[in-house]
Each structure stands twice: as C-alpha cells, then as structure tokens.
Amino acid sequence: MAGETNEDVKAMSFEQALDALEKIVDDLERGDVPLDQSIRIYERGEALKAHCDRLLKAAEDKVEKIRLSRDGKPVGTEPLDAD
C-alpha cells in the first residue's frame, strides 16, 4: 500500500477495485497488520467499496430488458425495473 492514495481508486475498473478490496479484507482478517497500517488500509477499503458501489449503480442504470413480440422475437428494449 505504500505510496498509494485513495485518489488512484477513481481510475480503477470494478474488477481492480474489488481485487484490492478483497486483499485488504484478507489482510485485516489475518490480524497481523500493525494498528496504524490497519487504519490506513481500512480507510482505503472504504474508498474502494464506495467506488465499487458507484460502478455497480452505473451498470445497473444501463441494464435494459429485451422486449419480445408475441412469437418470441426481440423487438426492442426498455429500462429494466429492478424492483
């Protein structure tokens, strides 16, 4: 984590951010990280989680449902109602 700031999180893809978050969780669960470093990586984890949440929300907003005709052929799309 040395040299990394939370600003670089914004440039990460969802997969990169999720991988980094999973590593942080593993490190914290092992419990062999010094307290000051635990606090720093926890804060980074919060930034990674927020970034992943934003990217997921953006992806959900783009998902569309395919409309089918009576004979089952695709005729267009409409926004997906996730509720």
From Swiss-Prot:
<keyword id="KW-0269">Exonuclease</keyword>
<comment type="function">
    <text>Bidirectionally degrades single-stranded DNA into large acid-insoluble oligonucleotides, which are then degraded further into small acid-soluble oligonucleotides.</text>
</comment>
<dbReference type="GO" id="GO:0005829">
    <property type="term" value="C:cytosol"/>
</dbReference>
<dbReference type="InterPro" id="IPR003761">
    <property type="entry name" value="Exonuc_VII_S"/>
</dbReference>
<dbReference type="GO" id="GO:0008855">
    <property type="term" value="F:exodeoxyribonuclease VII activity"/>
</dbReference>
<comment type="similarity">
    <text>Belongs to the XseB family.</text>
</comment>
<protein>
    <recommendedName>
        <fullName>Exodeoxyribonuclease 7 small subunit</fullName>
        <ecNumber>3.1.11.6</ecNumber>
    </recommendedName>
</protein>
<keyword id="KW-0963">Cytoplasm</keyword>
<dbReference type="GO" id="GO:0006308">
    <property type="term" value="P:DNA catabolic process"/>
</dbReference>
<keyword id="KW-0540">Nuclease</keyword>
<dbReference type="InterPro" id="IPR037004">
    <property type="entry name" value="Exonuc_VII_ssu_sf"/>
</dbReference>
<dbReference type="GO" id="GO:0009318">
    <property type="term" value="C:exodeoxyribonuclease VII complex"/>
</dbReference>
<keyword id="KW-0378">Hydrolase</keyword>
<dbReference type="Pfam" id="PF02609">
    <property type="entry name" value="Exonuc_VII_S"/>
</dbReference>
<comment type="subunit">
    <text>Heterooligomer composed of large and small subunits.</text>
</comment>
